[in-house]
Every structure is written in C-alpha cells, then in structure tokens.
C-alpha cells in the first residue's frame, strides 16, 4: 500500500479524477477505498472518485492498494522474479471554489521488487552465560529463517558472527556446518541450496567451544551478519549461489 497525502491550502477541495502511471510489469489494478481500477497500457484512471480534502496543512491521506500479478517461472508466461514496478500519481482533477482544475504532478511510490516468496530472518536468542574458563560444545545462539506462506525459498548462505572455536551449526537439530579452529565473522553455505517449505520455519542453533578469560561469568551470543551476505532465492529462480538474491530488500532481517 502506498499512501499519498493531498493538501489544500486555500480552502476545501474535492478530488474528482486521479490518474496513475505504472512503470515496469506486474501491476493488475489499484484500489482506493472501495473503488478498484484496472491497469490498461500502464495507466490507471479513477474517474468521479470525489474525495473531500479539508482546508489546512494536514490534508487527506489516500491509501492506494496495489494488486500484483503472480510471479512465475519464465516459461509459464507470468511476471519474472525480480521485476521492478513503480506507481506514480501523474494527474489530478479537482474542484475548489467552484472552479475545476487539472494538474500534472509526478509523485512516485517506492519501487517494488516482485518475488514469488521471501524469507523472514531473525536472531531469536538472548545469549548464554559462560563461567570463567573453557566450556566445550555449548549452545551459544539461535537464528531462524522462515518462508512466506506464498511459496518455498532456497537458502544459499546464512551469515553470522560468534566468538567461539570448533563451531557447529544445526538446522532443526541436524548438523549442517562444522568449522575447526576459531570462528568470528563467518557463514553457513549451502552450495546446492537448503529448501524451506512455504509457511515453514527452520531453526539454526550455533554450538561451539568458548573460552572466558575473565574471572567472572560473561554473556555470549550469536549475531546476524550483513544482510548483503545473506543469499537466497525464490524457487521460481532456482539460481546458483553466485546469482542469488541478497537480504538487503527483506522487510524482516534482525
């Protein structure tokens, strides 16, 4: 949903018609309130919408809901994964003081990158208290990766930081990574991809040997690495790791 704010500074006004221009592919229609208008040739027209804009600096917020086409494999004739679409308000006809006027703004909503599904990535642990000395094979922290209900995702690389040695990462209880020696900033890499089913969540637990050189207990935990180093794909792509998507556009990566 994109929200447009319209202000009328010289008395109240009525928005009669609105026109939006759609760049890119994938937009089927826009909806304002209970009115839905289709995209025809990259243009969406709302005629006779008659929205009242009060006088003053607060104006009127207009939520515009966008319906996108499904993302499918290239040979299925749908919208390609990673297609980018932008919706721009390009014409406003309004009435104020008995006079009807048409203006041509260019107010674009944020561009949207379309995918078949997407992951939610979280660090869910709060750390573990380690006594002075060496503790071996202790569970240090936990991360989760969940696939959206709309489709499977493929995980290629999960970046994280941890202060430990002989690190083992378990996915839902099964070993998937073993790192001998000291590990700090590192990643669990799945060269052929780790598939997560639609609506499912995989828990990644990080174990390792921890040396606390102090005289008191200290808290140790894992942290997520840079979202730019998180590698994934929707199943539509089936891409190798070198061309996978990153986590920079994910709505939840924390």
Regions found by a protein language model. Give the residues of each.
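Exposed, polar/acidic Ser/Thr-rich sequence context and nearby capping/turn residues
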Residues: 1-254
């Amino acid at each position: 949903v994109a929200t447009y704010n319209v202000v009328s500074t010289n008395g109240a006004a009525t928005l009669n018609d609105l026109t939006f221009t759609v760049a890119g592919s994938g937009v089927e229609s826009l909806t304002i309130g209970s009115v839905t208008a289709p995209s025809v040739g990259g243009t969406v027209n709302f005629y006779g919408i008659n929205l009242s804009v009060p006088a003053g600096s607060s104006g009127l917020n207009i939520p515009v809901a966008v319906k996108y086409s499904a993302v499918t494999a290239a040979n299925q004739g749908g919208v390609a994964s990673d297609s980018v679409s932008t919706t721009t308000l390009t014409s406003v006809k309004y009435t104020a003081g008995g006079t009807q006027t048409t203006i041509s703004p260019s107010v674009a909503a944020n561009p949207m990158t379309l995918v078949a599904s997407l992951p939610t990535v979280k660090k869910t642990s709060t750390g573990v208290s380690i006594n002075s000395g060496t503790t071996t094979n202790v569970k240090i922290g936990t991360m989760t990766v969940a696939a959206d209900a709309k489709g499977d995702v493929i995980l290629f690389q999960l970046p994280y930081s941890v202060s430990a040695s002989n690190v083992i990462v378990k996915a839902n209880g099964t070993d998937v990574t073993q790192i001998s020696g000291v590990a700090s900033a590192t990643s669990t890499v799945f060269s052929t991809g780790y598939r997560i089913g639609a609506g499912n969540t995989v828990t990644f637990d990080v174990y390792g040997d921890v040396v606390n050189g102090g005289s008191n207990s200290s808290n140790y935990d894992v942290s997520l690495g840079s979202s730019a180093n998180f590698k994934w794909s929707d199943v539509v792509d089936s891409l190798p790791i070198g061309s996978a998507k990153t986590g920079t556009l994910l709505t939840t990566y924390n």
